[in-house]
């Protein structure tokens, strides 16, 4: 059965900032041309499509934000399932079919867990790479990525250059080291349970020991 709702996340891996899960409900003919996995789109194209998706009368959009404190306090797999369920609950109707981009190595298990966590009686399927193969999931990936990028821009305005937020980003690592050196800890926008933060703490402790 053709899905009526697509769900995807953005920002699962970064050490800085929130994760966002978006759900999009629409008849496929209502979706604008050019929908694709958000990672394949230029920033300008992604934002133009996100604006059209948010503004269209026949398209319903829901976004769930998982803040760093929530991520630090929870199991990431459990939180991802709960956020997908909350997002689809925001737009779906009972009896409808939902397709998620699988957030687990076992796509079937992920679908079953999301269905169990949802308050609505919906049929949930999950596929790896669905953001590139299904237009509704692609639309959800665009909305989620747009929300994440706007969030990172706001963090940069508040804290200065934070980079992309990913652990491999030199700007992000420099931001984390400087914040820890100056404050003795990390600001609320940081996922302090990430191994990147643990390494920075360990480096600082070793530096202190070397000073004796």
From Swiss-Prot:
EC numbers, comma separated: 3.1.26.4
Matching InterPro entries: RNase_H2_suA, RNase_HII/HIII, RNase_HII/HIII_dom, RNase_HII_arc, RNase_HII_hlx-loop-hlx_cap_dom, RNaseH-like_sf, RNaseH_sf
Cofactor or coenzyme needed: Mn(2+); Mg(2+)
EC primary class: hydrolase
Gene Ontology molecular-function annotations: manganese ion binding; RNA binding; RNA-DNA hybrid ribonuclease activity
Cofactor annotation remark: Manganese or magnesium. Binds 1 divalent metal ion per monomer in the absence of substrate. May bind a second metal ion after substrate binding.
GO biological process, one term: mismatch repair
Residues of the RNase H type-2 domain: 2-206
Primary location recorded for the protein, binned into one broad class: cytoplasm
Catalytic activity: Endonucleolytic cleavage to 5'-phosphomonoester
Keywords, in A-Z order: Cytoplasm, Endonuclease, Hydrolase, Manganese, Metal-binding, Nuclease
GO cellular component, one term: cytoplasm
PROSITE patterns listed in its UniProt record: RNASE_H_2 (PS51975)
Localization terms from the record: Cytoplasm
Family annotation (SUPFAM superfamilies): Ribonuclease H-like
Function: Endonuclease that specifically degrades the RNA of RNA-DNA hybrids.
Family listed: Belongs to the RNase HII family.
NCBIfam families referenced in this protein's UniProt entry, alphabetically: ribonuclease HII (TIGR00729)
Protein name, UniProt field: Ribonuclease HII
Protein source organism: Natronomonas pharaonis (strain ATCC 35678 / DSM 2160 / CIP 103997 / JCM 8858 / NBRC 14720 / NCIMB 2260 / Gabara)
